[in-house]
């Protein structure tokens, strides 16, 4: 698989490469490091929007991008969730729901691609992704990084909403596969 030299592919690669940096600064455990980690996560999350937008608008869609963009998204979200679970006592249930859905949907998407069925990303799924990224940004920063006492609680509430939407939006993939079971 050849990586075409184009901006969307570089943004996808950058999103993957920033993950260890986010984790590293998170474990430094001071307010400046937390702020930097949250900022890096926000920037990485924003690249998720721009890589797809630029690829479609300027006809720069590649096989690499189609394959690795969702992988980069899952790696970013999954690594941050695991990091938060280990270090900050974030509620496990919404985290596990999000992780389980992402793995299942990734498998279903691969299966659907084999049988030549495409399930478009819904607006609700885009809202789900935004809320996941927003909640995780808040939780990375947390009360320790911001000095805002209840910021962790706000992040957890948004994470629960994102988990609920995660389950709802995952259903469309199961529905598309139903006739193959």
UniProtKB/Swiss-Prot annotation:
Membrane topology of the entry: Multi-pass membrane protein
PROSITE patterns reported in the protein's UniProt record: CDP_ALCOHOL_P_TRANSF
Keywords per UniProt: Cell membrane, Lipid biosynthesis, Lipid metabolism, Membrane, Phospholipid biosynthesis, Phospholipid metabolism, Transferase, Transmembrane, Transmembrane helix
Transmembrane segments: 8-28, 35-55, 64-84, 148-168
Example GO molecular function: CDP-diacylglycerol-glycerol-3-phosphate 3-phosphatidyltransferase activity
Keyword Lipid biosynthesis applies: yes
Location of the protein in the cell: Cell membrane
Record's keyword annotation contains Cytoplasm: no
Pathway: Phospholipid metabolism; phosphatidylglycerol biosynthesis; phosphatidylglycerol from CDP-diacylglycerol: step 1/2
InterPro entries named in the record: CDP-alcohol_PTase-I (IPR050324), CDP-OH_P_trans (IPR000462), CDP-OH_PTrfase_TM_dom (IPR043130), CDP_ALCOHOL_P_TRANSF_CS (IPR048254), Phosphatidylglycerol_P_synth (IPR004570)
Domain of life: Bacteria
GO cellular component, as recorded: plasma membrane
Enzyme Commission number: 2.7.8.5
Substrates-to-products reaction catalysed: a CDP-1,2-diacyl-sn-glycerol + sn-glycerol 3-phosphate = a 1,2-diacyl-sn-glycero-3-phospho-(1'-sn-glycero-3'-phosphate) + CMP + H(+)
One GO biological process term: phosphatidylglycerol biosynthetic process
Function: This protein catalyzes the committed step to the synthesis of the acidic phospholipids.
Homology family: Belongs to the CDP-alcohol phosphatidyltransferase class-I family.
Matching NCBIfam families: pgsA
Protein name: CDP-diacylglycerol--glycerol-3-phosphate 3-phosphatidyltransferase
Organism: Rickettsia conorii (strain ATCC VR-613 / Malish 7)
């Amino acid at each position: 698989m050849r990586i075409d030299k184009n901006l969307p592919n570089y943004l996808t690669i950058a999103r993957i490469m920033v993950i260890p940096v986010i984790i590293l600064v998170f474990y430094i455990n001071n307010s400046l490091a937390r702020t930097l980690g949250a900022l890096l996560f926000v920037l990485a999350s924003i690249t998720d929007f721009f890589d797809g937008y630029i690829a479609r608008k300027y006809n720069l869609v590649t096989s690499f991008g189609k394959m690795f963009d969702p992988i980069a998204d899952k790696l970013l979200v999954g690594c941050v969730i695991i990091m938060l679970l280990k270090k900050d006592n974030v509620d496990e249930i919404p985290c596990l729901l999000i992780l389980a859905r992402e793995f299942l949907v990734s498998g279903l998407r691969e299966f659907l691609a084999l049988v030549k069925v495409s399930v478009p990303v819904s607006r609700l799924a885009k809202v789900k992704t935004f809320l996941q990224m927003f909640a995780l940004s808040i939780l990375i920063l947390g009360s320790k990084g911001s000095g805002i006492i209840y910021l962790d609680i706000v992040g957890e509430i948004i994470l629960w909403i994102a988990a609920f939407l995660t389950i709802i939006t995952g259903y469309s993939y199961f529905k598309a596969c139903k006739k193959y079971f």
